[in-house]
A protein has these predicted regions:
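Conserved beta-strand signature within the Rossmann-like core of class I S-adenosyl-L-methionine
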Residues: 272-281
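Class I S-adenosyl-L-methionine-dependent methyltransferase module
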Residues: 8-40, 104-222, 320-327, 332-339
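A short beta-strand submotif of the Rossmann-like class I SAM-dependent methyltransferase core
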Residues: 244-250
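Conserved class I S-adenosyl-L-methionine
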Residues: 83-98, 116
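S-adenosyl-L-methionine
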Residues: 2-81
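Conserved SAM-dependent methyltransferase scaffold
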Residues: 99-103
């Protein structure tokens, strides 16, 4: 027995619901630039299920942080002048879709706002071989996927033993990926939409953008919206007014030492009086729920401003590290009740 993968848009129509998302070819990411319904659907299905070798999931989807955006808006209007050149950064923004949704609203509130969406990985690397095979790698050279229609093999997950043919294909793919890793890690691209293609006969090496077409469209439409690479463990070169970091400072991805390092990076990246929007989306609940804390930077740490659905689970840790002011229960701090 073998499990067929989704290798084309026609496969998406016929096999959807049969092949799990991990068996959707990352090659289809390239078709998103066509900006038609089927290609964007394929892009969103891949992104929603994409897990990198670090364990970080790219999971995101349209409207995911809509209630967070609605909550934050009035606080920003009450803290900053409408004509101020507000600098907003959205860290670990995945494909940038929810960033673009938030940015469009902020541009109406703050016409001079500069918005930067960032993520550590903005593209994957595709190696197309002359025999119809494709290997998908992270920019560092770590293999993610092997595609040889009708097979789509994920290197992060193993198929059930009953799919014997898939397991044989995986063994072959692991050998091929190992021989290509060093070559892939040698090449660099200037941006996520860099069209440069390297030829190492019989192979062609190019990138697959991980940026959603709607975010890319906004990036082309206005200089006020940027998409850049950035690590959530590193401070910015220049401090800004607002940083949002949703669904990244999580113990599934980082130990306490790195989470503390990330919190310090946020603190050092904010202007005095700047805001940090911290939280996660609890997908286990149906419907999903955002648990968020809004904090303001002071001279000595962060001051609590508002909580949504009980606030971030990291509040206690931040307090133990001395990053939340002891006088946090101020009159303007309020909690949005849980459902």
């Amino acid at each position: 027995m073998f499990k067929k993968g989704i290798c084309s848009i026609s496969d998406l129509r016929t096999l959807r619901g049969v092949a799990p998302n991990g068996h959707i070819s990352c090659n289809l990411l390239r078709l998103a630039e066509l900006e038609n319904k089927d290609s964007i659907q394929a892009f969103e299905m891949i992104i929603r299920d994409l897990e990198l070798s670090s364990g970080v999931c790219r999971t995101t989807y349209r409207g995911r942080l809509q209630d967070v955006d609605a909550l934050v808006g009035p606080y920003l209007l009450g803290s900053f002048a409408r004509q101020q050149g507000l600098e907003v950064h959205d860290w670990a923004a995945s494909d940038g879709l929810v960033s673009s949704e938030w940015a469009r609203g902020l541009f109406r509130m703050f016409p001079s706002c500069q918005f930067t969406a960032s993520d550590l990985t903005l593209y994957l690397v595709e190696v197309c071989r002359g025999n119809g095979e494709s290997y998908i790698f992270e920019p560092s050279g770590v293999p993610l996927q092997y595609v040889y229609p009708p097979f789509v093999v994920s290197f992060n997950r193993r198929d059930s033993p009953i799919f014997f043919a898939n397991r044989l294909v995986r063994m072959r793919a692991e050998h091929g990926a190992k021989s290509l890793q060093r070559i892939v890690s040698q090449y660099r691209w200037s941006d996520f939409d860099d069209p440069t293609e390297y030829c190492v006969p019989p192979d062609r090496i190019r990138i697959l953008p991980l940026v959603h077409p709607e975010a890319h469209s906004l990036h082309r439409e206005t200089k006020h919206f940027r998409i850049v690479p950035h690590s959530v463990l590193s401070p910015l070169l220049e401090p800004v007014h607002v940083i949002r970091s949703m669904n990244i400072y999580h113990r599934r991805y980082f130990g306490d030492a790195d989470i503390a390092k990330g919190a310090e990076a946020v603190f050092n990246s904010l202007l005095l009086g700047g805001m940090w929007i911290l939280g996660r989306t609890v997908e286990e609940r149906k419907p999903a729920r955002n648990e968020v804390s809004i904090l303001r930077k002071t001279q000595s740490g962060f001051q609590m401003m508002c909580r949504l659905n009980g606030g971030s689970e990291l509040e206690e840790s931040l307090r133990s590290w001395g990053l939340i002011d002891s006088e946090e229960c101020l009159a303007h701090c309020r909690a949005i009740p849980e459902d």
